[in-house]
Amino acid sequence: MADHIKDKSYYANARTEMLQFIPKDAQKILEVGCGEGKFSALLAEQGKETWAIEPNPKSAEIAAKSLNKVFQGTIDERLSDLPDDAFDVIVMNDVIEHLTEPWDDIQKLKSKLKKDGVFVSSIPNVRYAKNIFHVLFKRDWKYADDRILDITHYRFFTKKSIRRLWEENGYSVQRMKGINRTKSFAYFPFAVLLNILLLLSQLDVFYMQFATVAKKK
């Protein structure tokens, strides 16, 4: 299948909501799939040393202007360029779902973290209210250019399977929080009704993504 061409804005999201998950004392940070480097540039402004890997050549070129080091290529292509036991934090903001074998990749990257280093990630939640609504009532699963049903996503996750991804691959989850809660007039009431009927057991459906901080075991 031919590569799906993304709009330029796809690579330029600063993801400011993820800054809260970066430890304050972290000094050296690697972002995998940095796009144009907007998120890591915010960390650089705080005095952090910022490294990145980005497969898109144009985005990597832009990111290199504001970050300390940027390697253009995939994880497998550039893993050997990264020093072992070097990073306080590795970040993947909505990247894991684009990987064909994410469990292998997070295991490979573990050696690049310092002893007390953490892996910070944002991963889309396939149980988001909009998705459930479309499957149940529109009886459809329609891929799109972005968001949860992005046509370039290889893997789909729930809150439970996100935790399992980390716990079964050499990490312990330190923190997990839903982010980007639905504000839609159509889907917020649906999520509320679902939780009323099921005694608040479906709170995960409110969130588009889950942010996770995982420490290597």
Locations of the language-model features?
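Conserved class I S-adenosyl-L-methionine
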Residues: 120-142
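Short catalytic micro-motifs in class I SAM-dependent methyltransferases
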Residues: 93-98
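Acceptor-substrate binding/catalytic loop of class I
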Residues: 145-161
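A short hydrophobic/small-residue beta-strand
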Residues: 50, 119-120
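A short glycine-rich, Lys/Arg-flanked "PGG" loop and its adjoining helix->strand segment in the class I
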Residues: 104-118
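A SAM-dependent methyltransferase catalytic signature shared across enzymes that methylate proteins
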Residues: 160-177
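Conserved N-terminal segment of class I S-adenosyl-L-methionine
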Residues: 1-85, 89-91, 103-106, 160, ...
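Short N-terminal helix/helix-N-cap motif within the alpha/beta-hydrolase-1
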Residues: 100-104, 131
